[in-house]
Amino acid sequence: MSNELDFRSVRLLKNDPVSFQKFPYSNEDEAWKTYLENPLTAATKAMMRVNGDEESVAALSFLYDYYMGPKEKRILSSSTGGRNDQGKKFYHSMDYEPDLAPLESPTHLMKFLTENVSGSPDYTDQLKKNNLLGLEGVLPTPGKTNTVPPGPSKLEASSMDSYLLPASDIYDNGSLNSLFESIHGVPPTQRWQPDSTFKDDPQESLLFPDILKTSPDPPCPEDYPGLKSDFEYTLGSPKAIHIKAGESPMAYLNKGQFYPVTLRTPAGGKGLALSSSKVKSVVMVVFDNDKVPVEQLRFWRHWHSRQPTAKQRVIDVADCKENFNTVQHIEEVAYNALSFVWNVNEEAKVFIGVNCLSTDFSSQKGVKGVPLNLQIDTYDCGAGTERLVHRAVCQIKIFCDKGAERKMRDDERKQFRRKVKCPDSSNNAGIKGCLLSGFRGNETTYLRPETDLETQPVLFIPNLHFSSLQRPGGVVPSAGHSSSDRLPLKRTCSPFAEEFEPLPSKQAKEDDLQRVLLYVRRETEEVFDALMLKTPDLKGLRNAISEKYGLPEENICKVYKKCKRGILVNMDNNIIQHYSNHVAFLLDMGELDGKIQIILKEL
């Protein structure tokens, strides 16, 4: 039970000014008469016990018994032994010291009495049995001395040892008031652990402190320790939240929107093993190296076949003044790459836009988009050499109609729901989230440096079947193109656009037409022979007839075609390419001046 319950009756006396101020009592006997008029009945005691006030019942019973007795008998007697050695006893978990001088103070004495009354149920029962413990014997009053008569004390029991308390006097009204004041000032001893309901709530921590952190991304060398970081490239787009461990950082872009790409050296160009302060960088949009070059080119051809114009490029550079202030010699080395020269002692910035969607590489609807890579290769072009010195990559997903912002918001909501479901989850290693409305985290994405400087990127030029970048600004042409025929793919190169071949879809149809197949037989034969022309021209036809019938190709001088209406015409490349595929003919051979003359009669 608490000390608050122990002092309940005392608090009533202290806090009720009527008890002490309404009537001018001369001593405590008159003051207690008002309380004795309402005796402490058994019913009252039972109600107090039901409420858990056992100690208050014992204390009130003691006070009632004390003041109901004659004043002459209110003496606390003690044994003649005085302060003997038996006074130091361990009674009910309390060690009584022989020196009781501190009990002469009213405050300490009342505290001592209350603690013993409230802490010892056996002791309170003994008090109720004997009721001879006088308050005057316990509470000393200055100016009046009361001697302790010899003889055994009535407070003693068979299980209790005697001890001596100082002499006491009658306690007047003013002293009683001051005593209650001092008792109220002494904090009661806590006897139980306080209820958690009354504890001060601990300071609440943020729900997701790791998400609300808005500190900027550390520089690239700290993001990717152990990788070469002589150069540092950033893309001006927020970094995606959900990134798998070990993968390159990812950014969401809108189709056709220009984003700044910043290139710099952390040390300001100092300590770099370069032959010149100017380097050439190639910014390109490529597929991951896991895809073979043939598959990458197939994807690019499929994308280009669906574009409205042959001039449509994968990557574009904005014609803004800031580009030309920091970079020089901008060239479009391929449809998915551009190059420029910049000074390593200064920061370079270009604005690029990507014109393809991640879902443009499949004709099926609902297929997940293919992620692309934004790759930047930097070459040392000094002293007539072109040496690849640095490469960095980041993943990009391209959306249309502000889809990048919607994707970021969706990722934020997913991250929030995951955090709410698992508030104690620590799965935040490769993932960064955002909770606040409009919060986009870090507004830049750092490109991760790559250690593989050997793999050549696959670049796409529609009029070349295969092209691979060997040096910045140079492309390896396909067979049949000499180095002198190499076209510079600059932005202002109009001849290239004018001489550009039809779209890949039309090219595919033309390829089907170029595969010319003829069905021929002689008049004496009933079954046709198939003549597959290696090339859809007259030379291809002569070569096929020579191989089929064992004739020398150089001896075939004339080839004619006789229409159904009997018109005889000279066979030429145009007729073979456009009017002879899958056509059946009767083959008639004749000799003229030692040369072979062939007539194909249309059936």
Curated annotation (Swiss-Prot):
It is found in: Nucleus. It comes from the Eukaryota. The keyword Nucleus applies. One of its GO terms (molecular function) is DNA-binding transcription activator activity, RNA polymerase II-specific. The keyword Transcription regulation applies. Disruption phenotype: Mutant pups display neural tube defects and don't survive to weaning. During embryogenesis, fail to form the epidermal barrier and exhibit defective neural tube closure and embryonic wound repair. The epidermis show a severe barrier function defect associated with impaired differentiation of the epidermis, including defects of the stratum corneum, extracellular lipid composition and cell adhesion in the granular layer. Embryos have thoracolumbosacral spina bifida and curled tail, and 2% have coincident exencephaly. Belongs to the grh/CP2 family. Grainyhead subfamily. Transcription factor playing important roles in primary neurulation and in the differentiation of stratified epithelia of both ectodermal and endodermal origin. Binds directly to the consensus DNA sequence 5'-AACCGGTT-3' acting as an activator and repressor on distinct target genes. Essential for epidermal differentiation and barrier formation at the end of embryogenesis with TGM3 as critical direct target. Exhibits functional redundancy with GRHL2 in epidermal morphogenetic events such as eyelid fusion and epidermal wound repair. This is Grainyhead-like protein 3 homolog. The lineage of its organism: Eukaryota, Metazoa, Chordata, Craniata, Vertebrata. The gene is Grhl3.
